[in-house]
UniProtKB/Swiss-Prot annotation:
The lineage of its organism: Eukaryota, Metazoa, Chordata, Craniata, Vertebrata. Residues 42-53 have a biased composition (Basic and acidic residues). It is a single-pass membrane protein. The chain crosses the membrane at residues 242-262. Its main location: membrane. Residues 39-66 are annotated as: Disordered. It comes from the Eukaryota. Belongs to the TMEM191 family. The keyword Protein transport does not apply. InterPro entries: TMEM191B/C. It comes from Mus musculus. Residues 5-147 form a coiled coil. One of its GO terms (cellular component) is membrane. This is Transmembrane protein 191. Keywords: Coiled coil, Membrane, Transmembrane, Transmembrane helix.
Length: 302
C-alpha cells in the first residue's frame, strides 16, 4: 500500500516539476518572440531608411545634372556671343581701313594737283607714307591679334562641346553604375536572408534555449560586423564614385576657360576694347597734321 502512494507522490511531484518547466519554457518563448518582433521592426526601419536615402540620392543626382547642363549651355552661349563680337569688330576694322585708304588716295590726288614747294611736298608725302605704313602695320597686327583671339574662342567652344559630350557619356556610365550598386545590394541582402536555413533535426528541450540565444547573438554580431561596415563602406564608395563622375565633366568644362583667362588674359573683354575709336582717330589726326599745316598756309583748298 505504501509503494503505490509513493509512486503517486512521485508522479504528483513530477507533474508539478513539469508544469514549472512548462511555465519557464513559455516565458522563454514569449521573450524570444518579443525579441524577434523587435529585430523585425529594426529591419523594417533600416529598409525604409535605405529607401529614403536612395530617393534623396537620385534627387540630388538629377539636380546636379540639371545644373551642369544649364551651366554648359550658358558657357556655350557666351562663347558664341564673344565670337560674334570679335567677327563684327574685325569687319569694322576692315571697313575703317578701306575708308582710310580712300581718304589717303583722295589726299594724294589733291596734293598732286595742288602743288607747292617741291621740298615741302616731298617731306609731307614721305611723312604721310611713313604714317600710313605704320597705320597699316598697326591694322595688320590688330587683325592678326583678333584672328588669334577668334581662333582661341573657337577652340574654347570646341573644348566646351567635347566636355559636354564626355559629360553625357559619363552620365550614362553613372546610371549603369547605380544600377549595378542596387543589384549588388539586393544580392547581398538575399544572400544574408538565405545563408542560415532552419535545421529540421529535433533537438533536446534542455539545449533549445541556449542554441536559440546563441544563434540570435551570432546573427546580431554578424549584422553589426558586416551590415554596419560593409554596407556603409559600399555606400560611401558609391557616393564617392558618383561625386567623382559628376565633378569630372565640371572640371572639363571649366579648364579651357581657366586656360584662356590665365594664359591669354587679353583674349576676353579688354582685348576687344583695347583698340577703340579714340586711338584710331588720334592716329588719323596725327597722320593728317601735315595736311592741316599745308591748308593753314593756303596750299590746299578749304
Amino acid at each position: 500500500m505504501t509503494e503505490p502512494q509513493e509512486q503517486l507522490l512521485q508522479l504528483q511531484k513530477d507533474n508539478r516539476d513539469g508544469r514549472l518547466r512548462k511555465q519557464e519554457l513559455e516565458e522563454l518563448v514569449r521573450g524570444l518572440e518579443a525579441e524577434s518582433e523587435s529585430l523585425t521592426g529594426r529591419l523594417e526601419e533600416l529598409r525604409e531608411r535605405e529607401r529614403s536615402l536612395q530617393r534623396r540620392r537620385s534627387q540630388a543626382s538629377r539636380a546636379i545634372r540639371g545644373e551642369a547642363c544649364e551651366a554648359a549651355r550658358e558657357r556655350a552661349e557666351r562663347a558664341r556671343g564673344l565670337l560674334e563680337a570679335a567677327e563684327q569688330h574685325r569687319q569694322d576694322l576692315e571697313q575703317h581701313n578701306r575708308k582710310l585708304q580712300e581718304q589717303w588716295e583722295e589726299l594724294s590726288s589733291q596734293l598732286f594737283y595742288y602743288g607747292g614747294e617741291q621740298l615741302s611736298q616731298q617731306r609731307a608725302e614721305q611723312q604721310l607714307g611713313n604714317q600710313l605704313v605704320a597705320l597699316q602695320k598697326h591694322l595688320e597686327l590688330a587683325e592678326a591679334k583678333f584672328s588669334m583671339q577668334a581662333e582661341d574662342l573657337r577652340q574654347g567652344a570646341q573644348r566646351t562641346e567635347e566636355a559636354w559630350a564626355s559629360f553625357q557619356e559619363q552620365s550614362g556610365v553613372l546610371q549603369e553604375l547605380q544600377g549595378k550598386v542596387m543589384e549588388a545590394a539586393a544580392a547581398l541582402e538575399a544572400t544574408r536572408g538565405g545563408s542560415e536555413p532552419w535545421n529540421s533535426e529535433p533537438r533536446p528541450v534542455q539545449d533549445c534555449a541556449g542554441s536559440l540565444m546563441e544563434e540570435v547573438a551570432r546573427a546580431d554580431c554578424e549584422k553589426r560586423l558586416f551590415g554596419g561596415t560593409g554596407a556603409g563602406s559600399l555606400r560611401l564608395w558609391a557616393l564617392s564614385a558618383l561625386q567623382t563622375l559628376l565633378l569630372l565633366p565640371l572640371g572639363f568644362l571649366v579648364l579651357p576657360l581657366i586656360y584662356v583667362v590665365l594664359a591669354k588674359p587679353d583674349a576676353v573683354g579688354p582685348g576687344l576694347q583695347s583698340l577703340g575709336s579714340d586711338a584710331v582717330f588720334r592716329r588719323l589726326r596725327y597722320t593728317l597734321s601735315p595736311l592741316l599745316e599745308l591748308r593753314a598756309r593756303g596750299l590746299l583748298p578749304a
